[in-house]
């Protein structure tokens, strides 16, 4: 049995009931086998893989708060501080009923490689709670956020751990969290990113992940003598990542014909009218089906199956494991040529393999959606220097980072004889920087 197989079996045995974490570790270790085999004894002697797959610290705490009826509610809060070899922990907070330790470990593990790929000095972490902000009043959300931060503030800081938003944590929640941190600690520091522009936030942060996904796609296409102009897109999801991926794709000449939310999907053969989607999702906080009521010629379909629509480019920007093998087979049969992940691990392992084996150019989320955390790190830099860059400056830096990530993944894949295997390339490139830092810092 190889070293990578031994480590994977150990992960499964020691972390039962955490399938997302197992999946993330397997994908990375499978890619790294060609690297590890070249110098297995050194990696074994320092237990580098065992340390790489084990979080440095997992924090769990209760979050009591009072709802609008005066009833005390109790939720669970978590922070997985996965790896700080190349910088302070950095990664989002997710407020959603599905949140548990296993999902946060998978996200923190992925975040470690993603942050490494940006070239910026940030380690990997992830946190959140099983609290659901949907259907809660502003006062209830504030009460929860203040209680969460009262405990959470003990473990974070501008040079220790700098969280950001994620699913269920937007500008409102970040504001409440930052206010409570400042109140408790008496410090006005860049301890959170995704802040409002009036109190230390960065321009382009909201758009960054979605824009970055399309910048990555553009670079892949250029490498294959192709372009976005005139291509037909499907973009799953209708949150920040999806909306701004659509915006940038349309700016570069793409035609987006379908989007979705957790209830179903819309199809507009004339091209999605993004201003209407923004009004529904960002202003009214409504459901995507309202689009079909407002746009003549558009249709709404309940449930899944958005991949049945023909497209050249498929951008999964909703949630983990949304695209399974059946969907991948349909995409291939319909002539899809590019799949670039906007969400974290939205494609199952067997679907990823099928897409790659059938000539689809596939870029994993740890590379493609790194624009969000990269711009968070740029926000940290602005906070440290007490500066505020223009939107054009931030966007130019974001674009440069995404181009650089593509070339890191592309070069690593070619170096190991796996041209166009961007999954392996991204994993190898991210791994090399982290593991070099771990070696230099000794057994810790």
Please provide the spans of the model-predicted regions.
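Glycine/serine-rich phosphate-binding loop and adjoining beta1-alpha1 elements at the start
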Residues: 96, 115-229
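Rossmann-like adenosine-cofactor binding region
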Residues: 264-362, 367
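Flexible, glycine/charged-enriched surface loops at secondary-structure junctions
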Residues: 19-22, 38-45, 119, 156-165, ...
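Glycine-rich phosphate/diphosphate-binding loop of Rossmann-like nucleotide-binding domains
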Residues: 193-196, 201-308
């Amino acid at each position: 049995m190889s070293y990578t197989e031994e480590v994977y079996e150990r992960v499964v045995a020691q972390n039962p009931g955490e399938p997302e974490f197992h999946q993330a570790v397997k994908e990375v270790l499978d890619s790294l086998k060609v690297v590890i085999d070249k110098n297995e004894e050194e990696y074994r002697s320092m237990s580098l893989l065992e340390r790489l797959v084990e979080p440095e610290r997992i924090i769990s705490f209760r979050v009591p708060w009072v709802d609008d009826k005066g009833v005390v509610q109790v939720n669970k809060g978590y922070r997985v501080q996965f790896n700080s070899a190349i910088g302070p922990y950095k990664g989002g907070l997710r407020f959603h009923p599905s949140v548990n330790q296993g999902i946060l470990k998978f996200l923190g593990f992925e975040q470690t490689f993603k942050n490494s790929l940006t070239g910026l000095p940030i380690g990997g972490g992830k946190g959140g709670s099983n609290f659901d902000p949907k259907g809660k009043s502003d006062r209830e959300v504030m009460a929860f956020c203040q209680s969460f931060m009262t405990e959470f503030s003990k473990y974070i800081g501008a040079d220790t751990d700098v969280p950001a938003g994620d699913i269920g944590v937007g500008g409102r929640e970040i504001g409440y969290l930052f206010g409570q941190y400042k109140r408790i600690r008496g410090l006005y520091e860049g301890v959170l990113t995704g802040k409002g522009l009036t109190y230390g936030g960065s321009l382009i942060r909201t758009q960054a992940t979605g824009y970055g996904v399309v910048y990555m796609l553009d670079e892949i296409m250029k490498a294959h003598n192709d372009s976005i102009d005139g291509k037909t897109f499907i973009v799953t999801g209708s949150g920040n990542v999806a909306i701004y991926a659509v915006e940038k794709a349309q700016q570069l000449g793409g035609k987006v014909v379908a989007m979705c939310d957790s209830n179903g999907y819309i199809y507009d053969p004339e091209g999605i009218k993004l201003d209407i989607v923004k009004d529904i999702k960002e202003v009214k906080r409504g459901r995507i089906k309202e689009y079909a009521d407002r746009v003549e010629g558009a249709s709404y379909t309940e449930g899944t199956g958005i991949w049945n629509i023909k497209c050249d480019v498929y951008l999964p920007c909703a949630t983990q494991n949304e695209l399974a093998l059946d969907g991948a087979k349909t995409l291939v049969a319909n002539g899809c040529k590019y799949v670039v992940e906007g969400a974290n691990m939205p494609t199952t392992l067997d679907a990823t393999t099928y897409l790659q084996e059938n000539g689809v150019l596939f870029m994993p989320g740890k590379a493609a959606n790194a624009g969000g955390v990269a711009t968070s790190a740029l926000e940290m830099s602005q906070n440290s220097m007490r500066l505020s860059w223009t939107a054009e400056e931030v966007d130019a830096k974001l674009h440069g980072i995404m181009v650089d990530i593509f070339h890191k993944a592309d070069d690593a894949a070619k170096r190991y004889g796996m041209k166009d295997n961007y999954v392996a390339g991204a994993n190898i490139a991210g791994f090399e920087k982290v593991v070099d830092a771990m070696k230099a810092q000794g057994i810790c």
